[in-house]
Design a protein with these regions (language model features):
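Cofactor-pocket helix-loop regions in the catalytic cores of large enzyme subunits
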Residues: 20, 24-34, 48-49, 173-206
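Alpha-helical scaffold segments in soluble metabolic enzymes
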Residues: 7, 11-14, 18-21, 58, ...
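A general structural motif
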Residues: 180-188, 228-238, 253-254
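Internal, active-site/partner-interface "lid" segment
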Residues: 7, 158-194, 319-341
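Peripheral docking tails and interdomain loops at the edges
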Residues: 290-341
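Cofactor-/ligand-binding subdomain signature composed of acidic, glycine-rich
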Residues: 1-34, 38-41, 140-143, 149-172
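Anionic-ligand anchoring segments at beta-strand to alpha-helix junctions in alpha/beta enzyme folds, i.e.
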Residues: 21, 28, 39-88, 198-246, ...
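Glycine-rich phosphate-binding loops that contact phosphosugars or nucleotide phosphates
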Residues: 42-176, 207, 245-294, 328, ...
Length: 341
């Protein structure tokens, strides 16, 4: 097991409880920041990488749905210094040590530097002179579980409250919903693992706010089950990508066009798992997994729960040890204490 992390199943075992505690802390912190006027003005730009970038998808969707311009950007995909603008820049990093995210924040006007991190103190928290929203240094697995779900919660609550918005009451019930869904769906979802036994790849496809769920799911399948996987939006998938279907499994998140995509793929002889709130009849190749209808960020947390359950079972079927990572890159994380920080 990688130093500084707990086992995947250990993190999952206490996830519902830890998520509930984090939501309570985050709601209080965001409410206080809003009362101080710190969450007003132009919409936030969230920069992150990997799972942290995926976590910002549904919250950005929620902000745009309220008419607030907001973006999520890959921290390593832009020349530095980051262009000056009126929008606050939030570095999103569960460890607080992502090198690319730190580099972006370092290049931004100090008054516009903010962070959403799990670990405080950390280098990213230190340079975020505008403000830090901390998750509470929650113990997490190397292939992130509670760190990811709590990050989505933090960003979702922040999005709700931005510029005079109201934090959705459903957040106070989400941990209980999470636990109930986990109990109900675990046997059903684990039973789908044999679909991946001989799969050469996996496609994860999501409707607009669920693109982050598709991306995070593909990352988990690469990390935990070592299956080449890709996450993308439904609309992108329709523009040519689904033409290479064959030999893999298709996991689709959504309630509208996604139903037709799932039926089309299954009708053409491909294995499909459809994560949806709509009632869908199962077929020989179409396997619906029903989840509650929730606001975008809350729904994203339930969607990734389905993936967490599924990928662990798939790793078992394929004989992959969850805790064993193949590559450890030395330049993607900075030291916990770096010179000058």
């Amino acid at each position: 097991m990688t130093d500084g992390y707990i086992a995947y199943e250990a993190a999952r075992a206490t996830q519902a409880q830890a998520l509930g505690a984090a939501i309570t802390r985050l709601t209080g912190a965001v409410t206080a920041s809003a009362a101080e006027g710190a969450l007003s003005g132009p919409g936030p730009v969230f920069v992150g990488i990997g799972a942290s970038l995926a976590a910002a998808c549904a919250p950005v969707w929620a902000l745009r749905g309220r008419g607030i311009h907001s973006w999520r950007l890959g921290a390593g995909d832009h020349p530095l210094p980051f262009p000056a603008a009126a929008h606050p820049v939030f570095g999103v990093s569960q460890s607080g040590r992502s090198a690319e995210t730190l580099a972006v924040l370092d290049s931004v006007d100090p008054a516009r530097r903010f962070a959403v991190v799990n670990v405080v103190p950390s280098p990213i928290a230190t340079v975020a002179t505008g403000g830090v929203l901390g998750l509470g240094s929650i113990p997490d697995s190397y292939a992130s579980t509670i760190g990811y779900t709590a990050t989505v919660a933090a960003l979702g609550i922040l999005a709700d409250a931005w510029d005079g918005g109201r934090i959705d009451e459903g957040w106070s019930r989400l941990a209980a919903v999470f636990a109930a869904v986990e109990s109900e769906l675990t046997p059903r979802v684990r039973a789908l693992a044999p679909l991946f036994e001989g799969a050469t790849h996996a496609d994860f496809v999501g409707t607009g706010p669920a693109v982050g769920s598709a991306e995070a799911s593909a990352l988990l399948f690469r990390e935990v089950a070592r299956i080449p996987s890709t996450g993308m939006s439904t609309r992108q998938y329709l523009h040519g990508s689904m033409e290479s279907a064959g030999g893999g499994v298709h996991v689709i998140f959504g309630d509208t066009r996604e139903l037709d995509v799932a039926e089309t793929l299954a009708g053409a002889g491909h294995r499909v798992i459809l994560v949806t709130s709509e009632p869908v009849a199962a077929g020989p190749l179409l396997h619906p997994v029903t989840v509650p209808r929730l606001p975008a960020a809350q729904r994203a947390i339930i969607e990734i729960l389905v993936t967490q359950i599924l990928v662990a079972a798939v790793a078992e079927v394929r004989g992959v040890e969850v805790e064993e990572f193949v590559f450890h890159n030395s330049d993607i994380k900075v030291a916990a204490e770096r010179p000058g920080v």
